[in-house]
């Protein structure tokens, strides 16, 4: 059964541009995959702790030597990793804050880049045969001719992390100039509709099995 993992990082709820774009993607994916399964992971609704010293102690302890408290500390991380490993396609919906991803998405990444699970002990990525679509909403635009193009940290960072864990089939859909919606220059629905074709193409692309 084809499985889509939806990771949401915006705190803006129904007003969120990235969530609106992600919803378009999911609806299109469901049309393509009639028997597909969707896993929803809303990071704003997940009690996602930052990495702590006890967590690191549990992480670096071999599983056979972990105490029950250590296993409890890693339980959510294990769950997040299992979601990724069970998915064929992952869509990450995120705003851009200060040119990078929000803290909650960085915290998520710290929980899913795991030696022995998503990353081999020699550094090779273990998450193979999956596609990822990154859906981003930013106040400004980071197009090739943009004067702030070099400030786009978020895209490169997410591509790098995905490649590190083994996902190289990555499509980025950038909702730049989203501030126009907040300023009343364009309606939210019209802004989202401009990306309908990109969403359809991304949702329809086959996953290259490795």
UniProtKB/Swiss-Prot annotation:
Residues annotated to bind FMN:
10, 16-18
What the entry lists under InterPro entries is as follows: Flavodoxin_fold, Flavoprotein-like_sf, FMN-dep_NADH:Q_OxRdtase_AzoR1, NADH:quinone_OxRdtase_FMN_depd
Looking at the record's lineage, which domain of life comes first? Bacteria
Q: Which UniProt keywords apply?
A: Flavoprotein, FMN, NAD, Oxidoreductase
Q: Specify whether Amino-acid biosynthesis is a keyword of the entry.
A: no
Which GO MF terms does the UniProt record name?
electron transfer activity; FMN binding; oxidoreductase activity, acting on NAD(P)H as acceptor; oxidoreductase activity, acting on NAD(P)H, quinone or similar compound as acceptor
- Is-annotated flag, keyword Flavoprotein? yes
What does the UniProt cofactor note say?
A: Binds 1 FMN per subunit.
Q: Report which reactions are catalysed by this protein.
A: 2 a quinone + NADH + H(+) = 2 a 1,4-benzosemiquinone + NAD(+); N,N-dimethyl-1,4-phenylenediamine + anthranilate + 2 NAD(+) = 2-(4-dimethylaminophenyl)diazenylbenzoate + 2 NADH + 2 H(+)
| This enzyme's EC code(s) | 1.6.5.-, 1.7.1.17
**Cofactor(s) annotated in UniProt:** FMN
Any idea what job this protein has?
Answer: Quinone reductase that provides resistance to thiol-specific stress caused by electrophilic quinones.
How is this protein organized at the quaternary level? Homodimer.
What family does this chain come from, according to its entry?
Belongs to the azoreductase type 1 family.
Question: In its UniProt entry, what is this protein called?
Answer: FMN-dependent NADH:quinone oxidoreductase 8
């Amino acid at each position: 059964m084809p499985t889509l993992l939806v990771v949401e990082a915006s705190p803006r709820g129904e007003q969120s541009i990235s969530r609106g774009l992600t919803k378009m993607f999911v609806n299109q994916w469901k049309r393509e995959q009639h028997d597909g399964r969707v896993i929803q992971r809303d990071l704003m609704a997940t009690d996602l702790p930052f990495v702590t010293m006890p967590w690191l102690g549990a992480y670096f302890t071999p599983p056979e030597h972990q105490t029950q408290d250590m296993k409890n500390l890693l339980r959510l991380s294990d769950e997040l990793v299992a979601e990724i490993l069970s998915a064929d396609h992952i869509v990450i919906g995120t705003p851009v804050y200060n040119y990078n991803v929000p803290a909650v998405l960085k915290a998520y990444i710290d929980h899913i880049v795991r030696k022995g699970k998503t990353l081999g002990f020699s550094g090779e990525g273990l998450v193979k045969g999956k596609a990822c679509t990154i859906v981003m909403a930013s106040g400004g635009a980071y197009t090739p001719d943009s004067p702030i193009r070099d400030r786009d940290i978020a895209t490169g960072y997410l591509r790098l992390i995905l490649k590190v864990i083994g996902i190289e089939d990555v499509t980025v859909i950038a909702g730049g100039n989203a501030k126009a919606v907040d300023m009343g220059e364009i309606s939210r629905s019209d802004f989202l509709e401009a990306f309908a074709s990109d969403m359809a193409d991304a949702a329809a692309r086959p996953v290259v099995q490795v």
